[in-house]
């Protein structure tokens, strides 16, 4: 893996092959990249503290894989590989989804399923959710996160 094309995978070298006496530029780069997931770990910890039921948070794994990997309860998340992902994303309030975890619709974020379904989600909540938490990312080349609480469905009579 090359740091310009697959930075997360490149950084795994620091985790999978630790070598504290290696002071090469490559090892330093691996360590810098591996540290980039501190923000994602904090988001996972925050969501864990909410004691959410399974399938409560929708996110895409384009960037969200670090959060899932850090979560002690990955079943809290609905991700694109889940068979009901599209159904839940299309109507989150009717399907018990409580949060949408969004990244900016720029760079790799343009391919994020939430941004494709709700192009204004990151900026406005797309009329389906309300901004609850904004998390600036201190990681190398990683996006800032926004956690949106899904709006309750309005019942008309």
Question: Which ranges hold each PLM region?
Answer:
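Aromatic/acidic, Gly/Pro-rich catalytic loop(s) in extracytoplasmic/lumenal soluble domains
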Residues: 95-157
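Extracellular/periplasmic catalytic domains that process cell-envelope and extracellular macromolecules
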Residues: 51, 69, 91-95, 141
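Solvent-exposed loop/turn segments at secondary-structure junctions
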Residues: 63-65, 82-84, 105-109
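Short periplasmic/luminal acceptor-recognition loop of GT-C membrane glycosyltransferases, typified by
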Residues: 31-75, 99
């Amino acid at each position: 893996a090359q740091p310009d094309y697959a930075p997360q995978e490149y950084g795994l070298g620091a985790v999978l092959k630790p070598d504290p006496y290696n002071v090469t530029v490559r090892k330093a780069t691996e360590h810098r990249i591996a540290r980039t997931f501190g923000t994602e770990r904090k988001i996972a910890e925050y969501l864990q503290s909410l004691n959410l039921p399974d399938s409560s948070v929708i996110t895409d794994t384009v960037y969200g894989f670090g959060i899932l990997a850090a979560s002690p309860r990955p079943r809290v998340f609905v991700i694109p590989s889940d068979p009901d992902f599209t159904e839940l994303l299309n109507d989150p309030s009717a399907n018990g989804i409580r949060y949408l975890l969004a990244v900016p619709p720029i760079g790799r974020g343009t391919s994020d399923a939430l941004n494709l379904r709700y192009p204004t989600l990151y900026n406005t909540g797309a009329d389906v959710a309300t901004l609850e938490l904004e998390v600036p990312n201190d990681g190398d080349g990683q996006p800032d996160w926004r956690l949106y609480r899904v709006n309750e469905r309005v019942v008309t009579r």
